[in-house]
């Protein structure tokens, strides 16, 4: 790499046509662009699926080169209280659009972080300035947005970026950056991302910085992620009743990859879901794993909790 530009920003979509893996959403938004008008919008979905990129691309397509004059981005998780609505949002909303634009756009990222009082104030602001201003709200969980706001918005649900769409775009980035990537390295990127395109690009840039060829080993190492087959082996070993052997495998994963207890739990969950075992057994394993996850969030010792989980799996072999 010859420069220090962040690839996530360098390859951020500049138009709606460049947004990856959200075809249905983009098709609907293009209709608004053609009519040169949009309602209030609510984008919901997991991180890294293109919500922010889509909002900015929409503003570019609507307003052209001077889009920045009539677009402001705020992050609600930084300022959760009602003051951000009373001051910053109102201050921008009450000024007239610039350069002949029909309205201005306020993009509020992570809107589900706003308190209930702040959301109620936001709803009133949306009504008050609806003639000169449109709001685009972004959230991970639409259930955390109060119903009066939901009812005033067109809701767009962003899904994890599909594997093939992500693979195609990652290969394009590799070609432009002169990065050599193996097939297993590409598959590893897809796996660790979990549909989060931002995470995949960041991992690719990190891997490209430390080696001439990006392969699976590099990806798993820099992202502190175990290979799927290693995690499956851990589960199967414990289910066979080999507790001490499973414990040694856990030791190796935590030391080799530097994984935290939360990392282990998240990956165990992912592998259990995809394992070819009876649904009734999956229910048992996931139910118990949920208890471990809860205890970890409460501050319990991660090693004791993970050992206890492996011990539980080992007891199932005797039933």
Curated annotation (Swiss-Prot):
Pfam families: AAA, AAA_lid_RFC1, Rep_fac_C. GO terms for biological process: DNA repair; DNA-templated DNA replication. GO terms for molecular function: ATP binding; ATP hydrolysis activity; DNA binding; DNA clamp loader activity. ATP binds at residues 45-52. Heteropentamer composed of four small subunits (RfcS) and one large subunit (RfcL). Both subunits interact with PCNA. Belongs to the activator 1 small subunits family. RfcS subfamily. HAMAP family: RfcS (MF_01509). This is Replication factor C small subunit. It comes from Archaeoglobus fulgidus (strain ATCC 49558 / DSM 4304 / JCM 9628 / NBRC 100126 / VC-16).
